């Protein structure tokens, strides 16, 4: 797809679409329409008063004016919902530069528009989640044909904005098939508003269950259209049995690694009081105690499921790191850095998707490495390599600590949960109780999230029986790390490199370490669970990491050869788990155990995928718009493991 939708500009500054032969809007008309036809036409902000969440679905994002007006109204409303979801389908996204050129002049809206434009990039076909207001205003963009995207995605809408170029110029957006697809996402009572009063649109809406009426329009139009989804028949399909609204109460998250902290953060933003329990004395004592790791997208010629999933994860991880830094919980440059990552294809050249055009939105994600980047890494000009733009390094323990410091999250260490039991309370509402080996109560809550990694199956078996175990494979990983000498520091590239293991070349070390450190790893020791590893295993892993580095970055290896020739001084080892298809596991544990969910099996991509999976878990729990394509979400669903037994 092209870099962005071409835009012409009329003498009065109005954006004009050469593709459709029509203007987007004038500034005054566009704002009036956004405020009165759409926001007011759907009864907002009054309709969302005191709601836990509100979900707006729009056709035709354009320059985002309807979103900006809804966001502005949400900020100004003391009775606003805890979360505002705005979901918009757009086949031809404009560029961030064009968005800036068309910014409204009102100061308040202009500030919001600049924040939107800053995030408005890398919009390849698919689903993109952009977060604002510390994750409480969530924009989900469906990039692609509106009809196809609406048929494929999962959302229950409270309000619908039916927008776009006129039916004469863009008939597909107003077709009966599109209106049918919209109706599939309605609950009874969903309000719809549009400026279009064409007879075909009125009849199409009525045919698909909407009660339609004309209302006074915004000049120069005499009328607008208002509709309420209230079919005379009982709907079938997804809207027939809407998910029962869940009230945030108490939640126990078992496991204080990256996955557990991600679940705690996502649920606390939705009003849950979360207690995170772990056997260790401090958070991030397991696999998340890694000195530093990478978040980075994966690339493949066919743009595989993993490639698309990892882009969604990298975008959300970077956004969360920025958000936590804005709250003063992380320090950029010390706890994390979006350096970009060079991927050197030692065993096979990294291949970008075949259908990516350059220039194009894919350039915001990954592109061929430049001569300067290869030179900086000490690699030859013809080395097979690509550059990942939205990527960098993180100190996992600091990320975990930051998420556990969010309001509504409480840490409880030295909590050795041996069994979970579901019991009724005096008030009649069942709760889960976490019990130690002696049967003592450690904590109780209405919801439990298992983020235990290799300890998941033991707890499932002790709590639900042997048949509850999942087919998870333990994989031990070991890295080598140390403090730089002046000579080794000079041999390092200025950015991380992956492709055959990965090297974080320079990062601040905690405590009293004298200078920056480096990290190289990791090994993949399947079915190995012994911790700490034996001295012999540590030495073998140290040698393996050195051998990988020698192939990945010969110059960097020469600078660190003294470290690798000597016995390991600083190593780290932990056990991760992977599912049979090497994808994370997100969702309910069993129909027979209501309120028991899991977030696990991040494998070697915990920093890239855990935060996305935390948002997916919360979205599934609360019947929210999903933060990724529904097909990707289905691939991560815990229900798939039951089918493998």
UniProtKB/Swiss-Prot annotation:
A Gene Ontology biological process term: methylation
Keywords tagged on the record: Cytoplasm, FAD, Flavoprotein, Methyltransferase, Multifunctional enzyme, Oxidoreductase, S-adenosyl-L-methionine, Transferase, tRNA processing
Superkingdom, taxonomy of origin: Bacteria
Molecular function terms, GO-annotated: flavin adenine dinucleotide binding; oxidoreductase activity, acting on the CH-NH group of donors; tRNA (5-methylaminomethyl-2-thiouridylate)(34)-methyltransferase activity
Pfam families the record matches: DAO, Methyltransf_30
Catalytic activity from the UniProt record: 5-aminomethyl-2-thiouridine(34) in tRNA + S-adenosyl-L-methionine = 5-methylaminomethyl-2-thiouridine(34) in tRNA + S-adenosyl-L-homocysteine + H(+)
Cofactor: FAD
Residue span of region FAD-dependent cmnm(5)s(2)U34 oxidoreductase: 254-645
The protein's Enzyme Commission number: 2.1.1.61, 1.5.-.-
PANTHER family with a match to the protein in the record: SARCOSINE DEHYDROGENASE-RELATED, TRNA 5-METHYLAMINOMETHYL-2-THIOURIDINE BIOSYNTHESIS BIFUNCTIONAL PROTEIN MNMC
NCBIfam families hit by this protein: MnmC_Cterm (TIGR03197), tRNA_MNMC2 (NF033855)
Record-stated family: In the N-terminal section; belongs to the methyltransferase superfamily. tRNA (mnm(5)s(2)U34)-methyltransferase family.
Name assigned to this protein: tRNA 5-methylaminomethyl-2-thiouridine biosynthesis bifunctional protein MnmC
Species of the source: Delftia acidovorans (strain DSM 14801 / SPH-1)
Lineage: Bacteria, Pseudomonadati, Pseudomonadota, Betaproteobacteria, Burkholderiales
